[in-house]
Design a protein with these regions (language model features):
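Bacterial N-terminal signal peptides
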Residues: 6-16
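Small-residue-enriched, tightly packed secondary-structure blocks
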Residues: 20-234
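Positively charged n-region of N-terminal signal peptides that target proteins for export
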Residues: 1-4
Length: 234
């Protein structure tokens, strides 16, 4: 058991070091993953993508299990601008996913994960501190397909909806028990200055870095800003 633990920890630490080597590449990969997921025929319902206040993309989340397993991933969150988070898409902030999972066999599984943050309470929690899904914020597997006809009340009431893609299969997935937190160190490396997730998302005039342009462009193309959807007019 000790030997397995050492192997798994070496895998995690080694992957973390490699992941930290190039934050720009990680951010660019977020755009690639988001585009590929939206190209799937039965993907995220258009209505949900359009009304989401933020989108988090975690490429290659890895689960490592030792009886009681763990998961980790690094990615980015993009939110709509404006005090009510209902404007055009803004600049990305880097985020980290961490947590435990029970029941995995010894080994690792890589999965791309997308979260939709559906209301301001969820956004504020994510900008403030580390958030445990299913704890301080409600979370559920997101419905998929072109419409919301098959969605459940649970998913529609949740603050965060989660989706995954593994081995070419895309589906809503529950990630309760995992945690999301701002990765401000990674954001500082991307922007070249001292920044926080809240400052990036809510601060005035934060420019989208070149490495994040593809991700923002994908969101603008698939869920463009629409003046009629502003919350004040709903």
């Amino acid at each position: 058991m000790t030997r397995y633990l050492g192997v798994a920890l070496c895998f995690v630490w080694g992957s973390t070091i490699l992941g930290a080597a190039n934050k720009d590449s990680r951010l660019e990969n977020c755009g690639v993953v988001m585009q590929e997921i939206l190209d799937v025929p039965d993907n995220i319902p258009q209505e949900l993508l359009e009304t989401a206040e933020c989108v988090i993309v975690i490429p290659s989340m890895t689960k490592v299990a030792l009886g009681i397993g763990g998961s980790y991933g690094r990615g980015a969150m993009v939110c709509r601008t404006g005090a009510a988070f209902d404007g055009p898409w803004g600049a990305p902030a880097m985020y980290a996913l961490e947590g435990g999972s029970v029941g995995f066999q010894l080994g690792a599984e890589s999965t791309d994960v997308v979260f939709l943050v559906m209301n301001t309470r969820g956004v504020d929690a994510l900008l403030s501190s580390k958030v445990k899904l299913g704890g301080s914020v409600s979370a559920a597997a997101g419905p998929k397909g072109r419409s919301l006809e098959a969605s459940t009340d649970v998913s529609m009431r949740s603050e965060i909806l989660s989706y995954s893609r593994a081995r070419g299969l895309f589906a809503g997935v529950s990630l309760e028990g995992t945690s999301l937190r701002p990765d401000d160190e990674a954001s500082e490396e991307v922007y070249g200055r001292t920044v926080t997730a809240r400052g990036i998302v809510m601060g005035p005039g934060t420019s989208v870095p070149e490495s994040g342009r593809h991700l923002v462009d994908v969101l603008e193309k698939n869920a463009p800003y629409n003046e009629s959807q502003k919350k004040e007019s709903r």
